[in-house]
């Protein structure tokens, strides 16, 4: 890319942040990296909105099912109507939050165990088996 500023001409130099035009794979990976960084910056907000929308859709479908079921002639206990339709939609976002926290804890413990094992293998005392 060449730009004109006044009477002088400037051309950006080759560096690690400037993709070179010769290799298409490098440009593609550079662009994908930028898109991934943008997505990961906004991901918690998007996932929170999606969780709330799913819970609201579940609640509205539950209310519709309750209205249809109340107009029928069969007698059912109130628990049948309230169990999933109301509490399911209320607890769904909380359940997803708990799963995400458990994944973070599990990944932390897994990485910690690998680090301990690696440091033991690198720096630990190597004992050889001696015949009795």
Swiss-Prot record:
Alphabetical UniProt keywords: Membrane, Receptor, Transmembrane, Transmembrane helix
Q: Could you confirm whether the keyword Membrane appears in this record?
A: yes
Q: Where in the cell is it found?
A: Membrane
UniProt entry tagged with the keyword Coiled coil: no
Enumerate the InterPro entries for this protein. Answer: CD20-like
User: Where would you find the membrane-spanning parts of this chain?
Assistant: 52-72, 76-96
Please tell me where this protein is predominantly located: membrane
Q: Name one GO cellular component term.
A: membrane
Q: Which Pfam families match?
A: CD20
Its record classes its membrane topology as: Multi-pass membrane protein
Q: Which family does it belong to?
A: Belongs to the MS4A family.
Name assigned to this protein: Putative membrane-spanning 4-domains subfamily A member 4E
Q: Which organism is it from?
A: Homo sapiens (Human)
**What is the organism lineage in this UniProt record?**
Eukaryota, Metazoa, Chordata, Craniata, Vertebrata
Primary gene name = MS4A4E
């Amino acid at each position: 890319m060449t730009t004109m500023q006044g009477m002088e001409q400037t051309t950006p130099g080759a560096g690690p942040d400037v993709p070179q035009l010769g290799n298409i794979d490098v440009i593609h990976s550079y662009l994908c990296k930028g898109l991934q960084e943008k997505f990961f910056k906004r991901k918690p907000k998007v996932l929170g909105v999606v969780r709330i929308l799913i819970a609201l859709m579940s609640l509205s479908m539950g209310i519709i099912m309750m209205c249809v079921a109340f107009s029928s002639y069969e007698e059912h206990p109130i628990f049948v109507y309230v169990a999933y339709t109301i509490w399911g939609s209320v607890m769904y976002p909380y359940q997803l939050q708990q799963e995400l926290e458990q994944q973070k804890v599990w990944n932390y413990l897994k990485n910690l165990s690998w680090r301990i094992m690696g440091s033991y293998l690198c720096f630990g005392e190597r004992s050889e088996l001696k015949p009795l």
